[in-house]
């Protein structure tokens, strides 16, 4: 049986930690930044850990070798 392919869109947007959690960048930072306060913009920097259910769905359906 051939190897399963990873969805390349998911590969670009999410990463797995060593403990198996899924990391994604914060949403809401592409446009309409003028209406946001400086504190909101600052809090949108960096990455966030997805909730366990969303992380499970990402690993199960889009990262075929993400679930051990």
Swiss-Prot record:
User: Its Gene Ontology biological processes?
Assistant: translation
List the SUPFAM superfamilies hit by this protein, alphabetically.
Answer: L35p-like (SSF143034)
- Identify a single GO molecular function assigned to this protein: structural constituent of ribosome
Q: Which Pfam families match?
A: Ribosomal_L35p
| Superkingdom as given in the UniProt entry | Bacteria
Q: Which family does it belong to?
A: Belongs to the bacterial ribosomal protein bL35 family.
Its name, as the record gives it, is: Large ribosomal subunit protein bL35
The record's section on HAMAP family has:
Ribosomal_bL35
A GO term from the CC aspect: cytosolic large ribosomal subunit
Q: Which controlled-vocabulary keywords does the entry list?
A: Ribonucleoprotein, Ribosomal protein
């Amino acid at each position: 049986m051939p190897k399963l392919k990873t969805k390349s869109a998911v590969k670009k947007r999410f990463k797995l930690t060593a403990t198996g959690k899924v990391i994604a960048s914060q949403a809401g930072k592409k446009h309409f930044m003028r209406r946001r306060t400086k504190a909101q913009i600052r809090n949108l920097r960096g990455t966030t850990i997805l909730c366990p259910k969303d992380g499970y769905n990402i690993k199960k359906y889009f990262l075929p070798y993400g679930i051990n």
